[in-house]
A protein has these predicted regions:
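C-terminal motif of bacterial Sec signal peptides marking the signal peptidase cleavage site
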Residues: 17-21
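Early extracytoplasmic/lumenal segment of secretory-pathway proteins
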Residues: 23, 33, 37-119
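A structural signal for short loop-to-beta-strand junctions that line the ligand-binding cleft
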Residues: 47, 104-109, 127-165, 179, ...
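Periplasmic solute-binding protein
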Residues: 114-125, 145-173, 201-211, 288-294
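Short beta-strand->loop
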Residues: 127-135, 150-151, 179-182, 253, ...
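Ligand-binding pocket segment of bilobal, Venus flytrap-like solute-binding proteins
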Residues: 200-285
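Mature extracytoplasmic/periplasmic domains
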Residues: 293-352
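Extracellular/periplasmic bilobal clamshell ligand-binding domains
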Residues: 338-375
């Protein structure tokens, strides 16, 4: 899930991306994985358990992280050395991959999400691969993919977060739903991110489109604007700057962030750590984000790349995700750390839109939002 650089541990060796140079063990697919009838056997062929010394280059967004020991264990077991190359946010990584389609600068790409999926798949940048471990992935996440181009690795929700301590001090009740955010009693209290420059900003815009439809979302934003909503370019400026719980004397107790922000607040607090977060998530109006990994078409290390995809669905990686990237694992039954179980929000009715609809309309929606809110 593309999120800003907040809270990400320094747990992986990372190289910079420049355009100029920029458990392989498997289980058989059960009923939960869907039928493989009619699928090219080459697409489902599992990679070998180990390799001659091989380097696999992973292209990823800046927020990718994995614990050093988890990655080292994979490398020791398989003989594969993983070179992680980060190149900005998810949109930037996908754009660069599209520009180099067929002659990729890496072997595997992680971080394409459901707002970018149709564009990436339509550009033909991925070689199809159906991991045997896909059977263990949540069915709703598997349903987003056709043609075995990519594999769901994690998911999370972009949600409105509120500063509970601020509202308690003022004797006010925090907003409970999207409609409440336009109430005059919350005037000048909310900060959001620009959808043209921010992943959570785009997610929140898409949430309002999913809720209010083509005929109503601009009216909703007109009400937010009239109610004094502030727009920042990115998450850092909004959460760490203008949000009253962000640590820098911000004055706005309502911000667009992530459902996993409250547990992150505890994990990365200085000692003595608080027993509970001072912020919470407004469960209404969250937008579900899903991140995928895929083997890049044209790689000369396709089998090793497939092994890395399998690794991302294995329990060592899946268990590591919550506290490395503050996302939920895609594999059903993966245990969560206590801090996630207690404090990460799990909205029952997250909003979403079909990836193809997002791809077809994203630029138009962002342009219309810019005209309605910033001009």
């Amino acid at each position: 899930m593309r999120r800003p650089l907040f809270f990400c541990p320094v747990t992986v060796v990372v190289a910079s991306l420049a355009l100029a140079a920029c458990s392989s063990g498997s289980t058989s697919l059960g009923a939960s994985g869907g039928s493989t009838a009619g699928v090219d056997p080459a697409v489902t062929a599992a990679p070998p358990a180990s390799f001659a010394p091989t380097t696999v280059t992973l292209l990823a967004h800046d927020s990718f992280a994995v614990s050093k020991q988890v990655l080292a264990d994979f490398e020791a077991r398989t003989g594969i050395t993983v070179k992680v190359v980060t190149g900005g946010d998810a949109g930037e990584v996908v754009n660069k991959a599209v520009l180099t389609a067929g002659e990729p600068e890496g072997d595997v790409l992680f971080g394409v999400d459901n707002t970018l999926l149709s564009r990436a798949v339509g550009a033909g940048i991925f070689a199809p691969y159906r991991s045997a471990l896909l059977a263990d992935v949540r069915p709703d996440l598997r349903a987003l993919v056709t043609g075995n181009a990519v594999t769901p690795v994690d998911y999370g929700d972009i949600c409105v977060n509120v500063d509970d301590a601020w509202f308690a001090k003022k004797g006010m009740t925090p907003p409970a739903d999207l409609a409440a955010l336009t109430d005059p009693k919350y005037k000048d209290l909310m900060v959001v991110e620009n959808p043209a420059t921010s992943s959570p900003g785009l997610g929140f815009l898409l949430a309002t489109i999913a809720r209010y439809g083509a005929g109503g979302w601009k009216d909703y934003w007109a009400k937010l604007r009239a109610n004094g909503v502030k727009v920042d370019d990115g998450w850092t400026a909004a959460y760490e700057g203008d949000f009253s719980a962000g640590g820098k004397d911000g004055s706005r107790p309502i911000v667009v962030s992530y459902a996993s922000s409250p547990p992150a607040e505890i994990v990365y607090a200085t000692d003595p750590k608080p027993t509970h977060p001072s912020t919470s998530v407004m469960a209404d109006g969250c937008f579900r984000q899903v991140e995928f990994v895929g083997v890049l078409k044209g790689t000369t290390h396709e089998q090793a790349a497939r092994a890395f995809v399998d690794f991302m669905l294995s329990q060592p990686f899946q268990r590591d995700e919550p506290l490395s990237m503050f996302v939920f694992p895609s594999v059903v039954g993966t245990p969560l750390p206590d801090v996630f179980t207690k404090w990460a929000a799990t909205p029952a009715d997250s909003l979403t839109l079909p990836p193809a609809e997002i791809t077809a309309n994203r630029e138009t929606w962002v342009d219309e939002w810019t005209q309605a809110v910033l001009h």
